[in-house]
Amino acid sequence: MMSFVQKGSWLLLALLHPTIILAQQEAVEGGCSHLGQSYADRDVWKPEPCQICVCDSGSVLCDDIICDDQELDCPNPEIPFGECCAVCPQPPTAPTRPPNGQGPQGPKGDPGPPGIPGRNGDPGIPGQPGSPGSPGPPGICESCPTGPQNYSPQYDSYDVKSGVAVGGLAGYPGPAGPPGPPGPPGTSGHPGSPGSPGYQGPPGEPGQAGPSGPPGPPGAIGPSGPAGKDGESGRPGRPGERGLPGPPGIKGPAGIPGFPGMKGHRGFDGRNGEKGETGAPGLKGENGLPGENGAPGPMGPRGAPGERGRPGLPGAAGARGNDGARGSDGQPGPPGPPGTAGFPGSPGAKGEVGPAGSPGSNGAPGQRGEPGPQGHAGAQGPPGPPGINGSPGGKGEMGPAGIPGAPGLMGARGPPGPAGANGAPGLRGGAGEPGKNGAKGEPGPRGERGEAGIPGVPGAKGEDGKDGSPGEPGANGLPGAAGERGAPGFRGPAGPNGIPGEKGPAGERGAPGPAGPRGAAGEPGRDGVPGGPGMRGMPGSPGGPGSDGKPGPPGSQGESGRPGPPGPSGPRGQPGVMGFPGPKGNDGAPGKNGERGGPGGPGPQGPPGKNGETGPQGPPGPTGPGGDKGDTGPPGPQGLQGLPGTGGPPGENGKPGEPGPKGDAGAPGAPGGKGDAGAPGERGPPGLAGAPGLRGGAGPPGPEGGKGAAGPPGPPGAAGTPGLQGMPGERGGLGSPGPKGDKGEPGGPGADGVPGKDGPRGPTGPIGPPGPAGQPGDKGEGGAPGLPGIAGPRGSPGERGETGPPGPAGFPGAPGQNGEPGGKGERGAPGEKGEGGPPGVAGPPGGSGPAGPPGPQGVKGERGSPGGPGAAGFPGARGLPGPPGSNGNPGPPGPSGSPGKDGPPGPAGNTGAPGSPGVSGPKGDAGQPGEKGSPGAQGPPGAPGPLGIAGITGARGLAGPPGMPGPRGSPGPQGVKGESGKPGANGLSGERGPPGPQGLPGLAGTAGEPGRDGNPGSDGLPGRDGSPGGKGDRGENGSPGAPGAPGHPGPPGPVGPAGKSGDRGESGPAGPAGAPGPAGSRGAPGPQGPRGDKGETGERGAAGIKGHRGFPGNPGAPGSPGPAGQQGAIGSPGPAGPRGPVGPSGPPGKDGTSGHPGPIGPPGPRGNRGERGSEGSPGHPGQPGPPGPPGAPGPCCGGVGAAAIAGIGGEKAGGFAPYYGDEPMDFKINTDEIMTSLKSVNGQIESLISPDGSRKNPARNCRDLKFCHPELKSGEYWVDPNQGCKLDAIKVFCNMETGETCISANPLNVPRKHWWTDSSAEKKHVWFGESMDGGFQFSYGNPELPEDVLDVHLAFLRLLSSRASQNITYHCKNSIAYMDQASGNVKKALKLMGSNEGEFKAEGNSKFTYTVLEDGCTKHTGEWSKTVFEYRTRKAVRLPIVDIAPYDIGGPDQEFGVDVGPVCFL
């Protein structure tokens, strides 16, 4: 990045070059007009060979091209037509190839004879030296640091003309002298003209927070909140004060006749009536619990094949397979649309110097040239000794910031920052949503006695009081005399009671009498039971803002998070500043046909498609009966991790936290492994630009794109220039549901389905009496997933749940619309510097920052990879020759040049040093037979090469892609003869070559191991018919003979398709080197060999003269990691990693059979975990596991190794894996991984939406399970009513006929024994769990779970249910449970207690009375019997039953026991 910035500074300084001619011309619509010609903006032209101009936004900038004074290394340099400076002509190269087996190439021959001297040019008129110009005004720079600055190094690289040349004729140039010693440094140049404005600096660090602003204007009134829930009823108000006495009422009418007289004395009890007739049969009882499983029936006939199962979940991604063999070339795709014009390419590598061409014919005399440059200096003395190296210069000024990288993926949500300082109090907010009902408070202290309340409504008639004792009879009066018959008197008093008659039938209830006079005020009554919740009150006015909490202590620094996944490629940066045009390069070799590009990026979003047709309305689901509102349950445990919520509004600024402690120094890191092969050497000097290559053929067809949604054809838009990619916006709100999408493509074939459904159900048998609860049966195999049920009507919106913990980081959503900007928080105190994170993905482009002060001279970094080509710049002045560059990588083979003239024969070279043994090459295709050549002279024997050490055979690597063709290597030693391959197709018959010289016989090699058969190659093009020989039988391998005389190779046959690479054989021993043959003519470059090891560092050459600054290179490869810093403090915990892949689920163990219940002991300590059950069939795919530990450190430099970006390249892939790694993978792995993740998430969501009742996917209750899977049979399933962590799921019995969820008690029964002794004569109800020794209240569900978890499950089940039922079986011995046969009443019936402490009795309010299904405990018989109670209610909060209170117990011979039935919710 730094080097790029410095080069940008050079480019800016180049624009300040004093020789630039600025000609302001009239602008032609942003273009320019110059010398009568019109040019578009950014056009570059040469009005003369040694002048170049560019149109820059209406201004014409021209510059003289100054040729280099350096002598060219060629005998006859030429000035190409239209060019200014002389170049060496490029010779053609003959496409010859050295004969196979020939010795190494001889040394370079002597120079040829000098060419014919060219004609002398017209002498130029030497100019008089001009007077130096006056110094320019000092430059103005607003953002530069103050103080003296030295720009002379920048100016030194440019030739500054200081005057106009005039004067007399110059003599002929003398012969060139030897190079002089390096000249002294030049004088400083004139101050430059003001520079163009620099890049905008990056934003400064945030300043100190300003004072709090004034409160903003009040916000718009928000929409009305939803209606609050009904509040609880208030407590009864205190009685009002006593009112004033009312006015006297109007006199009432005359009263009615008085009541009958006092009631007479009660008669004696009558005799018992006759026994009534048998009552009508009772209502049919509820179905009993299911009986125990019957014996298995005979195997039925084969059922009809089941419906095809749904496709199974996709398997986890397999390990990466080996690269497949290279496919045959596909059909050429259709020609693509013309691409947009690319930026000018970077100059190609300098080509090799060709042989001198023949001198051209004399041209016509040219126009009189401009005054020539100053003549050569006279001959100088011999070169002096090179000076000592100068001290390194100071570090240059910091250049403008580089183009920022693309924005990375949105990271996972960071840990909460430290609390900010208190903000100014905000305006009062609108009314909040009504809160949830608070928990019931503790009872307050007892209030003072209230005033007398208003008298209540007359109560219902009480029960009859006990009979009074009969009074004594009064004495008889004397008989009176008979008087006259008077008028009928009033009704007399009642006579004495007659003989009691038989009890008559009960009369109808009489009408209520009028209210009696008001009684005296009674004493105030006790406080009544609190009333039920009243209607919800109106929401109260919002309270004032609470006071700020104290700042929390600073948290410890957590561990550093794992590096995030690599972000996507950023958008293309803006084009750089236009550079000077470079000199014309040599013709480059025509490029190979490029591979077809990958699919283009997505186009602009089309207009929305038409809405789909509205689907038919589904049939309404059955409406359940409305349940009464249950009591508020206790709060449930933490819910399942929710999907990530939308971003909340910005919170108030917290107070700044204190800075955390500084971390300790870390241990030094482990030494890194051996580095990969070094980067390519520095680029050679730029060659002349090549002629444009022929148009390449169309590449192979690209991968098939995904099916796009069919949008309506939009109108053709004008092609806009691509804008910069914006930063991702905040997440938008949830959009409205879109129209119905197109039908998806058919899914792949699913896994084999499970066995089909059971056969049709047989007729129902008669209902037997309910048996006791059976032992739990073995768990049956899971049935096949059923079809989704019909969607029911939309339920009413549920209450808002508590916020779940943050879910795992989802895939990045589409960028939402920009949200309103949040308030700016105050700046927190700076924390200690954390450990350097892995390099992040490049961020979006920032503005350029101001130049920093010069830093110290940095260590030279590794050479960067070439930068993207800039726009064409002005041509720079020709620089002095730089020091020789290191050899560049061999280029692709150039086109064959025309043959050059034969050079004179060179002297014989010395015998070359023996070459190191080459790697045995794979066996080549059969060459064409050459014609027999004339025998060559035998060369002298070469020195034997050293014997190489046999390396260890490595594991077979993946087949690498074919490399670029490299130069042909020198011949390797004779390899061990391999086994004959399968015969290849007949090649073209070549012309016979002349025989080669006889080589010395090699040492006999040891027999190699037989190689594996190679894959047969595909047929080559048909050759001319050879003389067919008869095919002989295959003989055994003979011992290797001496190598024969190699013939000259025929012309190369057509290249066959690449076969798969065979296993590499072990290196054979090196034979003695053959005598060097005569030097062959230079062959055409062979295919590129494998990359060589990095050579040893050569001796340091003498420092060359500083060349001109080169073009900006591509960004360098990432540097090697610096030394490990000190150990930092443990960072804060990173965000949760992505969920792991789905692990295979362990099968559930078989359930054991229950033993006989023993007597209830005190609760023991929790037992050890039982042994693992036997392996069952695999269950459904499990949820993703927790994140694994961090992986091993990735490859060096770049956060995510470049090898991963290159599609996980070959074995040797390193920092340059995108260039030297595997075949391109088109990044399909990323797509597959994303699709796998999506399918995995889809499967998990499917199991959440439609759980199957397994332990891994528990349902909420059995009713949900019945709706999702109507095919399931009644039995035991797992449910998780609180929908929290599924580790606390409980096993229940699901009645799939009704959808009831039944939870068994724990324990299931109370042992039958003598539980209670009471010697008092007066009996009463005694609660088993509260009062009896050894008694306990009944609990339910899994005993391994804590009691409070089970309570929460029950609370949720009650909320989810509208009905509940339970039965209890009371086993008795000499104890009455319900009806007392002796007295005929139920006074001795036992009581049951519900979970809300309500009591259920035999008679009274019908809502709290139980029913009796069977009553065998009606009298004392000395035998055991039983009574079965059942209680059903629409208030699920009343169940389950937690205690029982018998009445008729306490005697020494009275015993009882209880079977607690399951509680069932529906």
Swiss-Prot record:
Q: Where is the composition biased (Polar residues)?
A: 146-155
Q: What is the effect of changing residue 957 to S?
A: In EDSVASC; severe variant
Biased region (Basic and acidic residues) positions are 229-241, 266-277, 823-835
Signal peptide positions (record): 1-23
GO CC terms in record: collagen type III trimer; collagen-containing extracellular matrix; endoplasmic reticulum lumen; extracellular region; extracellular space
Keywords noted in UniProt = Aortic aneurysm, Calcium, Collagen, Disease variant, Disulfide bond, Ehlers-Danlos syndrome, Extracellular matrix, Glycoprotein, Hydroxylation, Metal-binding, Repeat, Secreted, Signal
Biased region (Low complexity) positions are 99-108, 187-199, 251-260, 311-322, 355-380, 404-425, 478-523, 679-692, 787-796, 908-917, 946-961, 1067-1085, 1123-1133
Annotated segments matching region Triple-helical region: 168-1196
Q: Name one GO biological process term.
A: integrin-mediated signaling pathway
Q: Where is the composition biased (Gly residues)?
A: 390-399, 426-435, 528-549, 642-651, 669-678, 693-711, 729-738, 836-850, 864-873
Q: Where is this region: Nonhelical region (N-terminal)?
A: 149-167
Q: Which PROSITE patterns match?
A: NC1_FIB (PS51461), VWFC_1 (PS01208), VWFC_2 (PS50184)
What residue spans carry the region label Nonhelical region (C-terminal)? 1197-1205
State the disease link.
Ehlers-Danlos syndrome, vascular type: A severe form of Ehlers-Danlos syndrome, a group of connective tissue disorders characterized by skin hyperextensibility, articular hypermobility, and tissue fragility. EDSVASC is an autosomal dominant disease characterized by joint and dermal manifestations as in other forms of the syndrome, and by proneness to spontaneous rupture of bowel and large arteries. The vascular complications may affect all anatomical areas. Polymicrogyria with or without vascular-type Ehlers-Danlos syndrome: An autosomal recessive disorder with a highly variable phenotype and onset in early childhood. Disease features include cobblestone-like malformation of the cortex, polymicrogyria, intellectual and motor developmental delay, small joint hypermobility, vascular fragility, aneurysms, thin translucent skin and easy bruising, congenital heart defects, and foot deformities. Early death due to vascular dissection may occur.
Query: What is this protein's record name?
Result: Collagen alpha-1(III) chain
GN (gene name): COL3A1
